[in-house]
């Protein structure tokens, strides 16, 4: 049996979240694989707006650096418009961890570059503890910013 955890959904422009939702309305505001689909300037705007919405923290997950990604299945919103680095997040006050294994193992759409995929998938998993503490080597970044009250 699934728990009902959401009562209402809002659909709209992610850069208009401050107009759709109230200030400090959520304990945490999370953007998973979103920010890279915005231009860099828009990404920083999103971070500011997420900070406005959050009481305690904001969490962002994104590829480490720029990865070319074209429209998928005709969806123009799948295009990557920016790349984000550990230093980008450090400068914005985030703590950063690495996830999804070594950066050079994956390519477009986060797919493993080489076959057999099972072998390279195991290699990716085995490198997770390393990239967690050395996020510059990771394929994906997990960035957390504590909001000061």
Cite the ranges covered by each PLM segment.
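Glycine-rich phosphate-binding loop signature in dinucleotide/nucleotide-binding domains
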Residues: 20-25
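Histidine-centered divalent metal-coordination motifs
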Residues: 33-37
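Conserved acidic residues
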Residues: 7, 27, 56
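Class I SAM-dependent methyltransferase SAM/SAH-binding core
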Residues: 1-17
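A conserved beta-strand element that flanks and buttresses the S-adenosyl-L-methionine
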Residues: 30
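S-adenosyl-L-methionine-dependent methyltransferase catalytic module, highlighting the catalytic core
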Residues: 15, 19, 39-149
């Amino acid at each position: 049996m699934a728990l009902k955890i959401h009562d209402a959904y809002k659909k709209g422009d992610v850069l208009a979240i401050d107009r759709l939702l109230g200030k400090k309305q959520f304990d945490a505001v999370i953007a998973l694989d979103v920010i890279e689909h915005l231009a860099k300037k828009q990404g920083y705007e999103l971070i500011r707006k997420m900070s406005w919405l959050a009481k305690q923290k904001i969490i962002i997950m994104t590829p480490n650096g720029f990865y070319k990604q074209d429209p998928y299945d005709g969806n123009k919103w799948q295009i990557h418009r920016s790349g984000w680095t550990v230093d980008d997040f450090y400068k914005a006050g985030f703590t950063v961890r690495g996830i999804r294994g070594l950066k050079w193992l994956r390519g477009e759409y986060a797919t493993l570059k080489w076959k057999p995929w099972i072998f390279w998938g195991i290699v990716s998993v085995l490198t997770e503890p390393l990239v967690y503490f050395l996020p510059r080597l990771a394929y994906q970044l997990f960035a957390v910013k504590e909001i000061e009250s």
